[in-house]
């Protein structure tokens, strides 16, 4: 291979702060859950319709919340100012429809509008609390 490759950050300049805060909040609610970044929809969605699958295969989500069995449960998209205009809104509509069909929640966090307490309330709503262990009788 004659090509040159270099590494680049997984997240853009504004996303690490949101990722770290979501991670902290999710693990605080249920340590079995995880937050993953920049996940391809083709890895978490399936369709017998090849055309439908090709529409979502290469699309990515900003944050994916998975439960203790690594099942995708919720997607959180981080909307930065100009992101949600024109073609981006159309792409997000395709994501939303596919995720809804699969039973995966879709939520948006808007830069400059979502407060830390908004994030906490969202995570508390989305993440199932761990079941308490049943103590064996003495």
Curated annotation (Swiss-Prot):
**Keyword tags:** Plasmid, Signal
Q: Which domain of life is it from?
A: Bacteria
Read off the InterPro entries from this record. DUF2726 (IPR024402)
Q: Check the UniProt entry and state the signal peptide residues, or none.
A: 1-37
Pfam families of this UniProt entry? DUF2726
The similarity comment for this entry is: To H.influenzae HI_1631.
Write down what this protein is called: Uncharacterized protein y4bI
What is the species listed in this Swiss-Prot or TrEMBL entry? Answer: Sinorhizobium fredii (strain NBRC 101917 / NGR234)
